[in-house]
């Protein structure tokens, strides 16, 4: 199979035992009208036919992989949205916008549904879900297997709102890190959704195993429980209800008074969030780190002046960081002759990687091989103050804390790190904010309500900005004292690394309600 076609069409075919399980979720009779909107190699069709279903329709844009009397070899995206099917089942293509062909991108740009609910940050499978629901009869069932990140990502809010407004989920199977497809690392779910029906509770099957799924007896592999139906387009929490209650209690301590109008009797409460106390930015992009990293040689004074200290994810730990790497960093506009004259060691080292450097993504601008590809948030990172670094992604399957590190002045992050700088006029100390972010409460909140793909938590700007934050009531001497104690304890820990201090920090955080009791 052509690899570029496989990527642009999202051709990852479903194992037969998974198909049989999904068909087993169907409740319609053998004469029901059934659609498979992306047939792929026909595994769903073959299984449905073997089981006696006869009223079948399927779409497959790639005529090279299947020719079948039930298959329409054209794009499902352009099909007519008439409610006509009793059941829709399948494995929609998962393709990020950048991997779509130009023809596919044009098709989406011209599509009214895509323009209403999606954008170029969305995955291709989003529109398959929406169009499938539009083509279901009221009471019809949609059974799909797809990535789980539409439960939590910001770009899927439109999809989540559409799903809430047009029906409800009956069952969701969470595979987490279990391997379902060969060569696919994304965490996937199977869901059953009923159009136009209000189902009060969703049956969750939560499979907590890294082993490959080899049997259609899927429900015996995980924990089964029920949660209330989703009621908003915010992040969908699929954990048991007692965890949701504990998270709600923690969030209640992060609420502050919101003035509706001067002297109003109807003041409301709203969450204070990290985004209200910190400026947040993802790190800069060199495009080829090994070419910019400096070696143990005698660089000239000018070369050293044109370098920066970089802390990468590998340098970060909870509260502290273990070091940095010096990188070449020429800001001035020079030509190659001046590079050779004034930066001879840089030129020699760059020359070893020149072919690769010239092939970097240029962000639609002229990019000399000795320049960084994208100085994202450079002005923020140049502030002369301490800040907090965190890896952009963190696998948490065997961890109980994150790595929010308090980092010294004039150390810069690259693209595998996100930085948080305290906003001006925020009274809480950077040490207090660091302690808060490293708390068990924030770990659990991000685990269940953050942007999580499988067991990997994302720490880009928007997910970080959304974390509830416990502000200090400066009118209360008791809270001010706790804040000051935490600040001093963090400084003490950074000085001597005594683990007993971390326990003291946590005890003080708990006095402010910064805990999740599960």
From Swiss-Prot:
E.C. designation(s): 2.1.1.72
Record keywords: DNA-binding, Methyltransferase, Restriction system, S-adenosyl-L-methionine, Transferase
InterPro entries assigned: DNA_methylase_A-5, DNA_methylase_N6_adenine_CS, MethylTrfase_TaqI-like_dom, N4_N6_ade-DNA_methylase, SAM-dependent_MTases_sf
Catalytic activity as recorded in UniProt: a 2'-deoxyadenosine in DNA + S-adenosyl-L-methionine = an N(6)-methyl-2'-deoxyadenosine in DNA + S-adenosyl-L-homocysteine + H(+)
Molecular function, one GO term: site-specific DNA-methyltransferase (adenine-specific) activity
Family under the similarity heading: Belongs to the N(4)/N(6)-methyltransferase family.
PANTHER family reported for this sequence: DNA METHYLTRANSFERASE YEEA-RELATED, TYPE II METHYLTRANSFERASE M.HINDII
Protein name: Type II methyltransferase M.HindII
